[in-house]
Structures are given as structure tokens and as C-alpha cells.
Design a protein with these regions (language model features):
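Outer membrane beta-barrel
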Residues: 32-34, 42-44, 73-196, 223-227, ...
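Transmembrane beta-strand segments of Gram-negative outer membrane beta-barrel proteins
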Residues: 26-67
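Outer-membrane beta-barrel pore domains
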Residues: 27-29, 121-123, 143-145, 151, ...
Length: 375
């Protein structure tokens, strides 16, 4: 699948969704256009931390809250790092063909709006759906709705496992749904690529702006649900190119990457457990990372407390003393304000165990408050 073809497909998907005839906006049970949205107002402050000098251009003590979008909190209250608003529209072109677009504005970007989703969707039959265009890269269990803070208990999904340099992709995917002996089955396979200029995550690790490309993307996932249990397994492979905008240095160039992931979630009456495990393997560069999280909580009327433990560790035999290694704990309290809004308070303790040759963010404690809503 060539970049030119992907650009053409993406433009077509966006145009199909935006070129809606006036009659589609009329109210009624059979509206062709469906609109929805979400918003999060998040404030955070690092209460204490080990590092006192700046981390690149960021004041410390500091805490990385969103790797994928380069959001980092410092020693004063900040509201732009994770605050965001998004609007999504789906237009039914025919009973089987639809177009979807989603625009998101993030405070960390200066509230610049970006087209996060833009795809055409065709229902082949009751089991199969084919989609073409721009979507969220399905690395993690919460990837598809990670931006919708109202959809989960935390202020943010655990950062030790959630967050990588590429968030979206342009391509094609096919989704299969069925029931296997009492198990609800959902499976997805996809192909595509993504080009990220001035990559947001890499500005946390480099002084110079970096361009990152994930090409020859191929992957799939399988979600099984039965009763109290939901499980998910995923596999993704691709080639990685990274180049400095300043001097053209490649790091890496065409390196092969494999991603493996497992998740298992349980809901037993008021109690619930959330767990996830992921591996990123770039063996050609002797790089491999492992991360996991496990959390548990309970629902007590409008209140939902939750405790979560996380861990992340890299391996690199070329630079064994410059690996990132950390673990963390978070305590979250969610309060339901109504049918579509929730208030959350979260305390995070990040323990930096990185190698002596890596100058990282250091151990820190973060307090954050979020107001999440959907509409």
C-alpha cells in the first residue's frame, strides 16, 4: 500500500464525511448524520520529585503523563497538558456504507485541532466490516477510546504501559464479529503506515525535532468476552524510520519492530480487575521493552476507588547502563456527577530505576484532578 494511495484514501474518507447534504441534519429516528463528542479538563502538579534541574526544556521535578502527545507536568499547577475536546461525526451514505471523522483539540498542542479519524466503513455482512482511511493504532486495550476519559476509571491509562511514538495510522482494516460457543468474539486485522513530523513523544528524549515513520504496518487483535471475563491478544509488526530534522541523522533506519500485547479484565458485581502486558521488540538494535499494569477497584454508589501497580523495563546489551526502568503506583477516586460526567482525583508515585548513564525524569509524585464528560 503506497503513501500516495493512503493519502488519496484518507482525503476521500474525510470528504465523504464532510460533504453532507442539508437534509441529513433534520431531526428524527432516521437521521443520516450522528454527532457525538467528549471533553476532559485536567489539572496536575508534581508534589515532590528527585530531579531538580530541567529535563531538556521542561522544569522539574516532573512527571510524564502522556508519552504519545509529549505531555509532561512540572512543579506548578498546569491545565493544558491533558485537557482536550473532541467531536466525532458519522454519516450513513447507504445502509451498508458510512463515513466517520473525528477532530480533537489538545491543550498540549496549543489547542490545535487535528483530524484523528477519517475513514469509510462498509458492512459486508453481519459478521464482517471493512474500513479504509485514518484510525487509531490498536496497540492497547484502551487504544480506540483512550482519548475519552469518561470511559475509564483513571485520570489517564497507566503511563508505564500506555504511550508510544505513533498513535494513529492510515490504511485498511477488516473487523470480524461472531459468537463462538458462548464467547463473544471480535477480531481485527489491518495494514498501513504513519508519518509523524516533529514527533511529539521524541521531544521528550531529543533536543532536535525528529521525524518518525512506521511503515509496512501489519497486525491484528482478538477480543474474547464471556460473562465476567474479557481478554485481548494483539500482534503488530512494522519497519521504523527516525530522522533528525536538524542534521539528517537516522536512529534507526528501517529497523524491524514487533509488538505483542495481552489484556485480561474481570467484572464481578461491584468489583473489577484490569490488567495488561506489552512487549516492544527491536532485536536488530538489541532493544526490548516489557511493561505491565494490574489494578483493582470497586463501585460504591457514585464513588469508584481504584488502586493500580505498573512496571516498565528495557533491555539493551549495547548500552546496558542507559536503559529506562521504572515502576509506579496510583490511587484513583472517581465520582459520578451524572449520566455523562465524572470528577476524578488521582495520586501517582513514579519510581525511576533507570540506568546510571540515563539522565531521566527521576522519581516523583503527581496529584491530578479531571472533569470528564461525553455529549
Amino acid at each position: 500500500m503506497t503513501p500516495a494511495f493512503l493519502r488519496t484514501a484518507l482525503a476521500g474518507a474525510a470528504a465523504a464525511c464532510l460533504a453532507v447534504p442539508a437534509g441529513a441534519f433534520t431531526l428524527g429516528d432516521n437521521d443520516a448524520l450522528t454527532l457525538s463528542g467528549f471533553a476532559s479538563a485536567v489539572a496536575g502538579k508534581v508534589l515532590s520529585g528527585q530531579r531538580q534541574e530541567n529535563y531538556y526544556r521542561y522544569p522539574c521535578p516532573c512527571f510524564i503523563a502522556d508519552y504519545g502527545h509529549g505531555a509532561l507536568y512540572g512543579p506548578t499547577w498546569q491545565v493544558k497538558q491533558e485537557s482536550k475536546v473532541g467531536v466525532q461525526g458519522t454519516y450513513a451514505i447507504t445502509p451498508k456504507l458510512s463515513a466517520t471523522a473525528q477532530v480533537v483539540g489538545r491543550g498540549v498542542d496549543g489547542v490545535k485541532t487535528r483530524l484523528e479519524w477519517a475513514y469509510l466503513s462498509y458492512d459486508v455482512n453481519d459478521s464482517w466490516t471493512v474500513q479504509l482511511g485514518r484510525k487509531r493504532l490498536p496497540i492497547y486495550y484502551y487504544s480506540d477510546f483512550q482519548d475519552v476519559g469518561y470511559a475509564y476509571t483513571w485520570v489517564r491509562p497507566p503511563t508505564d504501559i500506555y504511550g508510544w511514538e505513533i498513535v494513529n495510522y492510515n490504511g485498511i482494516n477488516a473487523t470480524y464479529r461472531a459468537d463462538w460457543a458462548g464467547w463473544a468474539v471480535k477480531s481485527n486485522v489491518f495494514f498501513g503506515r504513519e508519518d509523524s513530523r516533529g514527533n511529539l513523544m521524541q521531544r521528550l528524549y531529543y533536543d532536535d525535532p525528529q521525524n518518525v515513520t512506521w511503515r509496512k504496518l501489519f497486525g491484528g487483535d482478538l477480543v474474547l468476552t464471556r460473562g465476567i471475563l474479557t481478554t485481548r491478544a494483539t500482534y503488530i509488526q512494522n519497519k521504523v524510520d527516525q530522522i533528525s530534522q536538524v542534521d539528517g541523522t537516522h536512529d534507526p533506519e528501517g529497523g524491524k519492530q514487533r509488538i505483542y500485547g495481552l489484556a485480561a479484565n474481570m467484572d464481578i458485581d461491584r468489583w473489577f480487575v484490569r490488567s495488561e502486558y506489552s512487549v516492544f521488540d527491536r532485536s536488530a538494535y538489541s532493544y526490548r521493552s516489557r511493561a505491565y499494569m494490574v489494578g483493582a477497584g470497586g463501585r460504591f454508589g457514585d464513588f469508584t476507588p481504584m488502586l493500580t501497580h505498573t512496571r516498565y523495563r528495557e533491555r539493551n546489551r549495547f548500552t546496558p547502563d542507559a536503559i529506562q526502568h521504572d515502576r509506579g503506583w496510583s490511587a484513583t477516586l472517581r465520582y459520578e456527577l451524572g449520566a455523562s460526567s465524572a470528577l476524578k482525583v488521582q495520586w501517582d508515585h513514579f519510581k525511576d530505576l533507570s540506568g546510571t548513564d540515563l539522565s531521566y525524569v527521576g522519581t516523583s509524585k503527581l496529584l491530578s484532578v479531571a472533569l470528564d464528560t461525553v455529549f
